[in-house]
């Protein structure tokens, strides 16, 4: 448990630290996670974990996976102080093999077909990363006095729903998530059932007290047959610690079948009836006193009505002036042309858009460590299948010219590391100008780090309010978005960046 808590603390620090140096020093925590290793194409890393699982069982789930360790934390809460609700503990349940392996097939099939959303939502590392970057990081920024920013309310909602669901399931059913919908846990279970080291119950010593089964978060200890289902066991050693007789041991000796036969357990069902409650009738409203009437039968104005009438009369000229101003603004706005055809811009460092979409897990590590806060989890800009992949919000900020932070921390190879010189020429988009919106202020010219924008005389066939108009040199533009961010034209900006490499 101590190793798991240390790994949980390191993973949490990786996503929430405000120090760039510390984030880069801790990037190895993300690089040893199984799903990022698979997407990065690290055959050696995957084989190493499979070999460790074949020897020791699912130690990854109890010592390395941050989401698994977080479930252990939630599962331990009812046991603190020996609360009455945990008096009966856990009970053995049959494995849900049909469901979990069918679900594993669906997730793998979606990933192969290019539908990354299933893996993005259910990969334990990515789900934990969103919890940290969307929930814990804003809280930590507020504590440290830094500007607090929720990158995406959609991602925040998904992270909050994931946290609540995982906490509730772990509170009541331990590691049920790991042994049903987690694709990593289901994959490792195919190997761990044949693990060399396993938990064995010595029937000559066991007194059938059932303590080991009551503390087993995986609900995999069958006391009727005195066997432990190695495909679900996460090697947490809680059963060994609680057995006072020393009857259960972690050993290479095998006194049972590789895949033990499980006895069906009929869960007890209880029906709770709640008495119906009758709503009490609402009290009758007290009658309002009638207004005093003048002798002629005309109602008298009280003080409130008098002042309200006076305010309406006094405000009438101001309302009319505001209406005329609104019409003038609408007339000017009608001449504005929206920037059409702009495609989403993805972070620098990708080999191609297809490679980026295939390898990105939507963990949010690049979003959490972007110093410009320009990265956002997508909400459909890249398609529903690629939701939560990072995109640039160039109206909120822009990509810093010398920054390579996102490429340094990406664990899957979706973004390859770039040097500062490589970043200076890496094209993520191209800027374009809508002449009807340009006011000729020249701010984009002064902000462009590449000198790709200049002011030129407006042609006769180009409508607009100014004599000069911004012009973009496409050969020099890299799509950093500084021009779009600084453009003061309202309500529609005069310059915008469209992402490149959108070949299907």
Language-model-derived ranges and their functions:
Residues 1-226, 231-232, 238-504:
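Non-ligating segments of multi-cofactor redox enzymes
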């Amino acid at each position: 448990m101590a190793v798991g808590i240390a790994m949980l603390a390191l993973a949490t620090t990786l996503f929430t630290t405000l120090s760039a140096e510390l984030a880069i020093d801790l990037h190895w925590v993300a690089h040893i996670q199984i799903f990022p290793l698979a997407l990065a194409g690290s055959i050696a890393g995957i084989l190493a974990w499979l070999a460790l699982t074949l020897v020791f069982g699912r130690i990854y789930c109890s010592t390395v996976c941050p989401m698994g360790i977080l479930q252990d934390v939630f599962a331990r809460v009812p046991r603190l102080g020996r609360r009455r609700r945990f008096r009966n503990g856990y009970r053995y349940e049959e494995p849900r093999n049909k469901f979990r392996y069918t679900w594993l097939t669906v997730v793998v099939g979606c990933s192969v077909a290019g539908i990354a959303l299933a893996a993005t939502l259910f990969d334990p590392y990515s789900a934990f990363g969103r919890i940290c970057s969307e929930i814990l990081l804003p809280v930590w920024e507020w504590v440290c006095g830094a500007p607090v920013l929720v990158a995406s309310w959609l991602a925040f909602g998904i992270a909050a729903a994931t946290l609540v669901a995982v906490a509730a399931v772990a509170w009541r059913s331990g590691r049920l998530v790991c042994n049903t919908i987690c694709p990593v846990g289901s994959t490792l279970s195919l190997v761990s059932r044949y693990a060399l080291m396993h938990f064995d119950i010595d029937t000559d010593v066991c007194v059938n007290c059932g303590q080991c089964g009551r503390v087993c978060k995986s609900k995999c200890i069958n006391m009727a047959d005195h066997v432990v289902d190695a495909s679900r066991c996460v090697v947490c050693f809680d059963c060994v610690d609680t057995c006072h007789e020393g009857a259960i041991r972690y050993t290479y000796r095998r006194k049972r079948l590789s895949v033990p036969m499980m006895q069906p357990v009929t869960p007890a069902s209880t029906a709770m009836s709640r008495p119906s409650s009758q709503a009490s009738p609402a009290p009758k409203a007290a009658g309002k006193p009638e207004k005093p009437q003048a002798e002629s039968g005309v109602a008298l104005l009280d003080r409130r009505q008098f002042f309200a009438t006076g305010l309406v009369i006094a405000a009438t000229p101001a309302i009319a002036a505001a209406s005329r101003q609104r019409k003038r603004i609408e007339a000017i706005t009608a001449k504005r042309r929206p920037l059409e055809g702009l495609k989403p811009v993805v972070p620098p460092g990708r080999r191609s858009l297809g490679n980026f979409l295939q390898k990105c897990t939507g963990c949010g590590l690049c979003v959490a460590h972007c110093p410009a806060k320009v990265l956002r989890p997508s909400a459909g800009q890249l398609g529903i299948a690629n939701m939560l992949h990072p995109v640039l919000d160039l109206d909120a900020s822009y990509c810093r010219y010398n920054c390579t932070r996102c490429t340094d921390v990406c664990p899957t190879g979706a973004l390859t590391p770039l040097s500062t010189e490589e970043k200076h020429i890496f094209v993520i988009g191209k800027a374009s100008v809508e002449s009807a919106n340009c006011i000729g202020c020249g701010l984009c010219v002064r902000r462009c780090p590449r000198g790709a924008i200049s002011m030129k005389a407006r042609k006769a066939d180009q409508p607009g309010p100014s004599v000069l108009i911004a012009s973009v040199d496409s050969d020099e533009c890299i799509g950093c978005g500084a021009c779009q961010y600084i453009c003061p034209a309202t309500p529609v900006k005069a310059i915008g960046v469209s992402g490149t490499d959108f070949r299907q």
